[in-house]
Amino acid sequence: MAAAMPLALLVLLLLGPGGWCLAEPPRDSLREELVITPLPSGDVAATFQFRTRWDSELQREGVSHYRLFPKALGQLISKYSLRELHLSFTQGFWRTRYWGPPFLQAPSGAELWVWFQDTVTDVDKSWKELSNVLSGIFCASLNFIDSTNTVTPTASFKPLGLANDTDHYFLRYAVLPREVVCTENLTPWKKLLPCSSKAGLSVLLKADRLFHTSYHSQAVHIRPVCRNARCTSISWELRQTLSVVFDAFITGQGKKDWSLFRMFSRTLTEPCPLASESRVYVDITTYNQDNETLEVHPPPTTTYQDVILGTRKTYAIYDLLDTAMINNSRNLNIQLKWKRPPENEAPPVPFLHAQRYVSGYGLQKGELSTLLYNTHPYRAFPVLLLDTVPWYLRLYVHTLTITSKGKENKPSYIHYQPAQDRLQPHLLEMLIQLPANSVTKVSIQFERALLKWTEYTPDPNHGFYVSPSVLSALVPSMVAAKPVDWEESPLFNSLFPVSDGSNYFVRLYTEPLLVNLPTPDFSMPYNVICLTCTVVAVCYGSFYNLLTRTFHIEEPRTGGLAKRLANLIRRARGVPPL
């Protein structure tokens, strides 16, 4: 009996934590998917989504062991009492007018909005510390987020996960439109993935190909979700999304055909061993069985049909966990070829899109204008508009005008928070009803302020960026969607769940603006210094030379033998001597 005890302890020691995992199922899971969509303009959009779900209450349980969920983000949730966190880095602009509505759009630059728990006493302090920590994690300039570019929206940004209340005091939102996205931001983003970039869909994340695109956006979304149908407990969901748009005419030598290797310079070799689901969706909505206009190779595992963003879509599904899909060739290169060139038809116009511009002349006054387009033939719907304007553009609120079809359009809800010089920006939120088949113009005049010479950014003649407008709306759908199980549906269809199948939620962003401010001639001090130093050096040098130089009078020397002979000859000729 005594000899059996050490043997039992040795067995438990050898099993370690893995032995206990045999009795208890894993509390976390990973799903990954790639959606490839040929756009109406001829470009190709690729959207990656990696969802890590952890059945744990991080703020109540003393978590010390992390398996799939990144430890760096898990500690942020616990330390700063986060309810939700949404961070995105975007290079380029999503052209909604030509590409259609995206699954998840983000503004140019960096965007961060966070919901804190109601137990946080000093939200501003936690917000500042959190932005500094995220700046270090993602190698970004998020440390430039301060009170001058932070606002607290009251209606535009609702929690995407579970929320008992919506006290907007615990919400913070900021945008850095000047932020430049590069590989330094992509590398830490990939390291958060359970398989990094070694296996699964993440092997396609090759930096030189991802940044050689018309549009690049990567994001991190953290939110609490229900663990079961009754929602008796919560789980934490981490979504890492990456969207890129390839120019098919450049990558395909003038053709609309595409393949994984042509776009990413890599192919899929093996699934991620930690993923419970790994799929590739290819949009084949334009496929016609009678005409057979396109061909997808290799044959897909199955097909999927659903109403996505108000349009019925058909997708070819490639299941990477299917052993017959990759093991046969150890190389999965999905290709789409057009058997005959597609007809050059005008791309369908989305029901909602917008654009923004600045007008005026001179460097004193100007006007901000936003055009909201509702192209639905017979349905009107409301749009929530959010504008964040820097403090150095002083808005004239009495000049705010909203017109639709030549008539005044009064907003049903308006919230305005004036700016304070060097402390906080302007915040303007409005709920506007867009008539059917109309263009609504929202304009407001402003005056440029004079900055201190220390407040100008590097290269001030380039201009100062103004954050884009944010549009949130429930757009009517042309096709009624059936209620689906959000846990079983694809990831690209479950970020904004809407119970009403006749509408779908979209959040769009306009272009960031570039405004010129009265800028002093920063080269003038340099010119003055150079001129002053030159004049002083020349004048002082001359006077100093005269005051310190010693002058000596030299007596003329008598000439030598040659000179005396020359003088004798000159005298003989009657010429004055030398």
Curated annotation (Swiss-Prot):
GO biological process entries: attachment of GPI anchor to protein; GPI anchor biosynthetic process; GPI anchored protein biosynthesis; neuron apoptotic process; neuron differentiation
Q: Which residues lie on this side of the membrane: Cytoplasmic?
A: 549-578
UniProt-reported outcome of changing E429A: Decreased function in GPI-anchor attachment to protein
- Substitution effect: E184A: No effect on function in GPI-anchor attachment to protein
Q: What is the effect of changing E455A?
A: No effect on function in GPI-anchor attachment to protein
What does the entry list as the binding residues for a 2-acyl-6-[6-phosphoethanolamine-alpha-D-mannosyl-(1->2)-6-phosphoethanolamine-alpha-D-mannosyl-(1->6)-2-phosphoethanolamine-alpha-D-mannosyl-(1->4)-alpha-D-glucosaminyl]-1-(1-radyl,2-acyl-sn-glycero-3-phospho)-1D-myo-inositol? N461, D521, S523, N527
Residues with attached carbohydrate:
N164, N291, N327
- Keyword Transmembrane helix assigned to the entry: answer is yes
- What results from changing G360V? In MCAHS3; decreased function in GPI-anchor attachment to protein; reduced amounts of GPI-anchored proteins in homozygous patient cells
- Disulfide bond positions: C195-C272, C226-C231
Changing N527S: reported impact? In MCAHS3; uncertain significance
Q: Which residues form the signal peptide?
A: 1-21
Disease linked to the protein: Multiple congenital anomalies-hypotonia-seizures syndrome 3: An autosomal recessive syndrome characterized by distinct facial features, intellectual disability, hypotonia and seizures, in combination with abnormal skeletal, endocrine, and ophthalmologic findings including impaired vision, as well as abnormal motility of the eyes.
Q: What is this protein called?
A: GPI-anchor transamidase component PIGT
Q: What is the lineage of its organism?
A: Eukaryota, Metazoa, Chordata, Craniata, Vertebrata
Q: Which gene encodes it?
A: PIGT
